[in-house]
């Protein structure tokens, strides 16, 4: 099977490696190089680097125009595998592939169709996540399901944790999907009546309101890691939060909202919220290194009694 691979994100790197090991990847479509680092030098993404190292043809156009279509046609692919590419394909492009196109989507479709299923699952406090390989359709994430699996989301898991899990555990589902397509199996139609949707994450998501419940705040903190990272002011410093958990309790009801009330060596730095106690587990002062809560407290012994704003 001649596979054309489309991705711009490192979440797909392990899948590219394993697919290329077992199949004929005839080309890779990815995003153009982007400025990176202090010098803002152009840098290729991990997908492009891996494909180049394997001598696979790489296309990184700004626009998927007719010239790109002709180049892909000349590669004579059977199928396109898409995993976090980041652009919408026109029908003219999808029609290139005689066996069709499949997409890896990190949710239990039809739940969380759209661009941020992992972040949205954590933001909503879901305890179960999933990976779906679907046939691509013109309507976003609405194609027939070829393979699917689910996994546990723990209370303290971040989006970064789930990205890593999905990256390492998608390949077998891709193999299952490819095998089904090779045998003429078209998959199972989604029940669109059960569909839910998610939108792009942006910098507004990083703003915290300590009047919310501890459950809601920890969800936002964990959803915003690795980007855009939730934060709040403490005195004149910006504190960036990387991981949190929570306690359902009515204790400390007389304390001010946003107040750091206790350091618990076995649980975290405790903060009063509108409902319950937030446990800060990993955090940093802006411009400093990320620390676990014990290291952060050891370097900031005057925390107790201060109030986040």
UniProtKB/Swiss-Prot annotation:
The keyword Protein biosynthesis applies. It holds the Pfam family Formyl_trans_C. (6S)-5,6,7,8-tetrahydrofolate binds at residues 107-110. Its EC number is 2.1.2.9. GO terms for cellular component: cytosol. InterPro entries: Fmt, Formyl_trans_C, Formyl_trans_C_sf, Formyl_transf_N, Formyl_transf_N_sf, Formyl_transferase-like_C_sf, Met-tRNA-FMT_C, Met-tRNA-FMT_N. Belongs to the Fmt family. Attaches a formyl group to the free amino group of methionyl-tRNA(fMet). The formyl group appears to play a dual role in the initiator identity of N-formylmethionyl-tRNA by promoting its recognition by IF2 and preventing the misappropriation of this tRNA by the elongation apparatus. PANTHER family: METHIONYL-TRNA FORMYLTRANSFERASE, METHIONYL-TRNA FORMYLTRANSFERASE, MITOCHONDRIAL. HAMAP family: Formyl_trans. This is Methionyl-tRNA formyltransferase.
């Amino acid at each position: 099977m001649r596979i054309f691979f489309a991705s711009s994100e490192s979440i797909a790197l392990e899948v590219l490696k394993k697919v290329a090991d077992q199949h004929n990847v005839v080309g890779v479509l990815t995003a153009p190089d982007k400025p990176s680092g202090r010098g803002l030098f152009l840098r290729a993404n991990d997908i492009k680097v891996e494909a180049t190292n394997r001598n696979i043809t790489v296309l990184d156009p700004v626009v998927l125009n007719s010239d790109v279509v002709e180049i892909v046609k000349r590669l004579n692919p059977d199928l396109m595998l898409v995993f976090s590419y980041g652009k919408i394909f026109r029908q003219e492009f999808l029609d290139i592939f005689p066996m069709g196109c499949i997409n890896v989507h990190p949710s239990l479709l039809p739940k969380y169709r759209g661009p941020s299923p992992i972040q949205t699952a954590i933001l909503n406090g879901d305890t179960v996540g999933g990976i779906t390989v679907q046939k691509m359709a013109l309507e976003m994430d609405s194609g027939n399901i070829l393979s699917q699996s689910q996994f546990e989301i723990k209370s303290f898991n971040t989006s970064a944790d789930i990205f890593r899990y999905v990256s390492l555990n998608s390949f077998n589902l891709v193999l299952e999907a490819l095998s089904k397509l090779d045998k003429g199996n078209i998959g199972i139609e989604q029940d669109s009546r059960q569909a839910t949707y998610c939108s792009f994450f942006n910098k507004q998501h990083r703003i915290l309101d300590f009047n919310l419940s501890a459950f809601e705040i920890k969800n936002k903190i964990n959803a915003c890691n690795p980007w855009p990272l939730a934060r709040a002011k403490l005195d004149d410093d910006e504190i960036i939060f990387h991981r949190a958990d929570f306690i359902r309790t009515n204790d400390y009801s007389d304390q001010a909202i946003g107040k750091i009330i206790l350091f618990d060596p076995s649980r975290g730095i405790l903060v009063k919220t509108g409902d319950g106690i937030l446990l800060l587990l990993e955090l940093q002062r802006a411009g400093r290194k990320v620390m676990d809560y014990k290291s952060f407290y050891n370097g900031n012994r005057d925390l107790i009694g201060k109030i986040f704003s």
